[in-house]
Amino acid sequence: MRMPLSVLTAAGLSLATLGLGTAGPASATPTAEGAPVVAYDGSPSAGSPADAKAEAAANRAFFEAVLRSVAEKRAANPKSTAAVTVVYNASGAPSFATQIARGTQIWNSSVSNVRLQAGSSGVDFTYREGNDPRGSYASTDGHGRGYIFLDYRQNQTYDSTRVTAHETGHVLGLPDHYSGPCSELMSGGGPGPSCTNAYPNSAERSRVNQLWANGFAAAMDKALEKSAR
């Protein structure tokens, strides 16, 4: 589904005109090939039972890593009445600062049980950028920490704000649904490059609010048990 770079060049588009770099920061190394990821437009074998199972497991692992990180911080101050806040660090993806900020604004205006906030301490997940044949994806670093990788070329082919908001949806617990319509944010690259919708639909908003009301409560219980030991 990716558009060849030569076609983009012929159309007068380039990494520079799109505000994207040509190489990621040295620290923004993609996850190793074969590591489980939740990709924007699916893996080469998308649609197979094995692939669907692997993606579901990767999405669950990513969400649980973020949830656990947030819950352990909250356990230190369990009586707080403040909204649940998920802290991210976007310093590893400077080329996408605008898209990340926009994606954060979209999600914060769409759901009420959780908030996304930029920060450099108490970070729950990070953004990275670079080139990877798998495109953009959400994954874990092997140490229980989640991150979102934003691929340069894919963000030329597809609407970059939609890609970023979609991947951020995995942070909040939503799985991919490539067969969905453009109005469904988590359909990712399924509807094709012409789809520019970067907003979750009502079902997606409701699911996130439910996950962070119910799922977070369970994660908090585990975090409190751990802190009491």
From Swiss-Prot:
Q: Where does Zn(2+) bind?
A: H166, H170, D176
Taxonomic path: Bacteria, Bacillati, Actinomycetota, Actinomycetes, Kitasatosporales
Family the entry assigns: Belongs to the peptidase M7 family.
In Gene Ontology terms, what is a biological process of this protein? Answer: proteolysis
What EC number(s) does the entry state? Answer: 3.4.24.77
Query: What is the organism of origin for this protein?
Result: Streptomyces sp. (strain C5)
Q: How is the cofactor bound?
A: Binds 1 Ca(2+) ion per subunit. Binds 1 zinc ion per subunit.
**What name appears for this protein in its UniProt entry?**
Extracellular small neutral protease
- An annotated GO cellular component: extracellular region
